[in-house]
Curated annotation (Swiss-Prot):
This is Serine--tRNA ligase. It comes from Shewanella baltica (strain OS185). The keyword 4Fe-4S does not apply. Its main location: cytoplasm. PROSITE patterns: AA_TRNA_LIGASE_II (PS50862).
């Protein structure tokens, strides 16, 4: 959520910056609402003051033995007018808030301006794609050949975009997640967390999935008088970041660095016809998430570090990748600056996204009222939040199967994963 004061004082600047993201802000309508808000605020305060003043005169009139019926009627009339103005004001504030909640974050000045993914800017590459001396297979054929990927039974049990993994492929998938967690906790300074896979509406509002992206979620329980609705998490970013919702943390506690390995659930409502085969785009998938909660002045350096942590996973696995900075038109809703890391997939002869690392600045913190107490003046200030995949486990499995395949369909196990595989050097 954007800073309301900045929005009011710098409306045209805000509109210009949001336009680079493809979001058109109706300046005239917002200006009209702001003028109406001010007018109603003044009217409400004046009515309140008048009612209070006249109410005080009732006691004085009674003390003098005067009839107060007319004064009581006047107070009642002012009360009715006040209630009506309060209802009008609440409606205006609700509309302003709805508009504010629909606005994406302002892009950082260092983010390249562009309309879509074709205008993202590559910043570096690592590794050289392998040259094969035999016809290569994609991860689907490789996984099925190893009797490790069972799409048919997944469809029978649940439906499309799900997977059953078995045997050494399932073990390899587990090993990948364990390796990532161990790396982040022992070398990168993250604390491992185990979090709920179901979250309430307040949590999804806090991190920005609601109200705009409700159709992308799997909702399991509707809201009732007894409580909020529950939805399956689309990413562990939601529960991890919400750990500081409605909190004021001490400055000495920062930075807070958390990681979790969870299943994630997405309806892929806007992805009809994309990646319909294989593991690239599933309704349920595993991901190791990294979250950092930092002081505002530290967030840009934290983004570089967090992106480096995700890249280190690929380097240790020996998987070629490239890192791109997303242009304004391709960034996620809550992001001010994002790096995407794309791993090389030989069967597709291209790089595909395997991690997205973003600095949200105070966008989520304002929605969550997540603050820290500044030691210098002992006053609370909004935190900055960052998140990134470290990495998507299923896509990492895809990359390993394809990059480490052998002519006979077997898969060489990357060296760093062998301790997690009981010392195996290959499967198949």
């Amino acid at each position: 959520m954007l800073d309301p004061k900045f929005l009011r004082n710098e409306l045209e600047v805000t509109a210009e910056r949001l336009a680079t993201r493809g979001f058109i802000l109706d300046i005239a309508h917002l200006t009209q609402l702001e003028e109406k808000r001010k007018s109603l605020q003044v009217a409400t305060e004046e009515l309140q003051a008048s009612r209070n003043a006249i109410s005080k005169s009732i006691g004085q009139a009674k003390a003098r033995g005067e009839d107060v019926e007319a004064i009581m009627a006047q107070v009642g009339d002012l009360g009715s007018q006040l209630d009506a103005k309060k209802i009008e004001l609440a409606a205006v504030l609700e509309e302003v808030n709805a508009i504010a909640m629909s606005m994406p974050n302002l892009p950082d000045e260092s983010a390249p301006i562009g309309a879509d993914e074709t205008e993202n800017v590559e910043v570096r590459r690592w590794g050289t794609p392998r040259t094969f001396d035999f016809p290569i297979k994609d991860h689907i054929d490789l996984g099925e050949g190893l009797n490790g990927l069972d799409f048919k039974n997944a469809v029978k049990i649940t439906g499309s975009r799900f997977i059953v993994m078995k045997g050494q492929v399932a073990r390899l998938n587990r090993a990948i997640g364990q390796f990532m967690l161990d790396l982040h906790t022992t070398e990168h300074g993250y604390t491992e967390a185990y979090v709920p896979l179901l979250v309430n509406e307040a949590s999804l509002l806090g991190t920005g999935q609601l109200p705009k992206f409700g159709e992308d979620l799997f909702h399991t329980k509707p809201a009732t008088e007894e409580g909020q609705g529950l939805s399956l998490i689309p990413t562990a970013e939601v529960p991890l970041t919400n750990l500081v919702r409605d909190s004021i943390v001490d400055e000495d506690e920062l930075p807070i660095k958390l990681t979790a390995h969870t299943a994630c659930f997405r309806s892929e409502a806007g992805s009809y016809g994309k990646d319909t085969r294989g593991l690239i785009r599933q309704h349920q998938f595993d991901k190791v998430e990294m979250v950092q909660i930092v002081k505002p002045e530290d967030s840009m350096a934290a983004l570089e570090a967090l992106t480096g942590h995700a890249e280190t996973v690929l380097q240790r696995l020996g998987l070629p990748y490239r890192t791109v900075i997303l242009c304004t038109g391709d960034m996620g809703f809550g992001s001010s600056k994002t790096y995407d890391i794309e791993v090389w997939l030989p069967a597709q002869n291209t790089y595909r996204e395997i991690s997205s690392c973003s600095n949200m600045k105070d966008f989520q913190a304002r929605r969550m009222q997540a603050r820290y107490r500044v030691k210098a003046d002992n006053k609370p200030a909004l935190l900055h939040t960052l998140n990134g995949s470290g990495l998507a486990v299923g896509r990492t499995l895809v990359a390993i199967l394809e990059n480490y395949q052998n002519a006979d369909g077997s898969i060489t196990i990357p060296e760093v994963l062998r301790p997690y595989m009981g010392g195996l050097t290959q499967i198949g």
